[in-house]
Amino acid sequence: LTVRLRPHHLLCMLTYVGKGYTSGFVENYDRVATRLNAGEEDIELVDGPDDICEGLLCESHAHCFNEGVVQRDERARLSVSALLGETLTAGKRLQTTPDFLVKMRLAFAAGEIRQACRGCQWIRLCDRIAASGFAGVKIGEPLPTVAKDAARFSKHPMLRPKYGSSGRKH
């Protein structure tokens, strides 16, 4: 089984603490978090609405199809692709291992994969969660050290791309 996620939700899942648009959205997101924490399911990248969006699709104000959200997905896809050293496209599967989550959270805290966050209504909440070392997150574990100065993480070994410009593994 897989959890279907659109690219910008790769970022949202890093700071999810149980807040959301509606109670139905939060209940659904909590179910997705439980599935990811069980470690038995991979993430499959999708274009458009995903398993997290299901909690909103029945709402009259669902924004999952808006052009701004599609652009947010593209910015997230590009920044996470650069971090991971591979091109992420629909159908790509990722495993939410502890190492994957730490790498993503370190990059998020350092601002290296936050391009998609511009204009998001949740940005201040996510800033606070990242600054706290990701305390209270519902997917994975918080970072072991509180990131008082997130920029110091930009040289962390886990942030090095898997593949260099030669295309070979480091």
Which residues make up each language-model segment?
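Long, hydrophobic N-terminal alpha-helical segment
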Residues: 1-38
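Short, mixed-charge aromatic SLiMs
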Residues: 35-41, 146-149
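PIN/NYN-family metal-dependent endoribonuclease catalytic core
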Residues: 40-48
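Mid-chain, well-packed structural core segment of small domains
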Residues: 61-99
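Cys/His-clustered metal-coordination modules, chiefly Zn-binding fingers
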Residues: 84-149, 153-159
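N-terminal amphipathic/hydrophobic targeting modules at extreme N-termini
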Residues: 158-161, 170
